[in-house]
Amino acid sequence: MARRPRNSRAWRFVLSGVRRDQDARSPTLPAEEEAWGYDSDGQHSNSDSDTDLLHLPPSIPSAVPVTGESYCDCDSQNDPYCSSLHTFHQIKSCQCGEEDNYFDWVWDDCSKSTATVLSCDNRKVSFHMEYSCGTAAIRGNRMLTEGQHFWEIKMTSPVYGTDMMVGIGTSDVNLDKYRHTFCSLLGKDAESWGLSYTGLLQHKGDKSNFSSRFGQGSIIGVHLDTWHGVLTFYKNRKCIGVAATQLRNKKLFPMVCSTAAKSSMKVIRSCCCRTSLQYLCCARLRQLLPDSVDSLEVLPLPPGLKQVLGNKLGWVLQMGSNRSNQHKGDTSATTSCGSDSDSSCTPGQDDCQRKRCRRI
């Protein structure tokens, strides 16, 4: 009996399941029913080549979460990845680094993708609660206008997939535009800037190496200096570089996005202050003191003033301090700073600030 020829289209349907983006399910859950005929970015594939289907495309993201990049040494944050469903549910909530009780802004319940859920007084955002079919995003409920703005985002879930990003953008960013496409949303156009968990920085669709990766337990700090129009990123409370300049007079919002199923991020600090003489002095003090010391502890300040500065400008004085250095910093970043402790990363550029202050 003659052998029946293979149906190439049927084989394409079978093998296309391999090409489905790994974001579509949590890395610790059993595989869901596959959607036939779709490639890794959610777009329909018209290729009839059997050879191409036998190999994974190089752009397929890893379903294995990033580990070992946590701010703290909690076991649940740094343990090697285990695909066991039991292990996933046994991960305990880590509270390290969450000292603040007052927040200038939280996530905006009216400016978010449909695949997002808010909790913890709108400070924690969870993406794709059951499964993922694209990219979800959200922005803060306050526009970052005049002054100095600093906030920290903590990765409270496994970090994996096509992309999970932290950044800023204008009100023109369509947060629901890519709800059926897996992509790096922040920085895809000229209206936003985004830092990926892979360490890539993106703006206008152009990506560049910026830092090492970050994962569950990592704390990503963002400083927007509207006085000079400068955007700076921190990882685990150590500077990793200046990401953008010439941002003056732009109406920006804090933003995050994720393609990963059952992923989440939490605002653990959001504060702002005027570009005052007090701020400039604190920024200069941080530059002059070694990174190994806590500025508020070593300076002979009256208790009342120390408390006021701690509440208002603690983020300026404590970046890179001893408390932060007890945790692992970003030592492999390739950024404009040259190193995590580079003084050019300290908030404020004193020479330029001094000149502008004289004009006031």
Swiss-Prot record:
One of its GO terms (biological process) is negative regulation of cGAS/STING signaling pathway. The lineage of its organism: Eukaryota, Metazoa, Chordata, Craniata, Vertebrata. Substrate-recognition component of the ECS(SPSB3) complex, composed of spsb3, cul5, elob, elob and rnf7/rbx2. Substrate-recognition component of a cullin-5-RING E3 ubiquitin-protein ligase complex (ECS complex, also named CRL5 complex), which mediates the ubiquitination and subsequent proteasomal degradation of target proteins. This is SPRY domain-containing SOCS box protein 3. It comes from Xenopus tropicalis (Western clawed frog). One of its GO terms (molecular function) is ubiquitin-like ligase-substrate adaptor activity. Residues 264-315 form the SOCS box domain. Pathway: Protein modification; protein ubiquitination. Keywords: Nucleus, Ubl conjugation pathway.
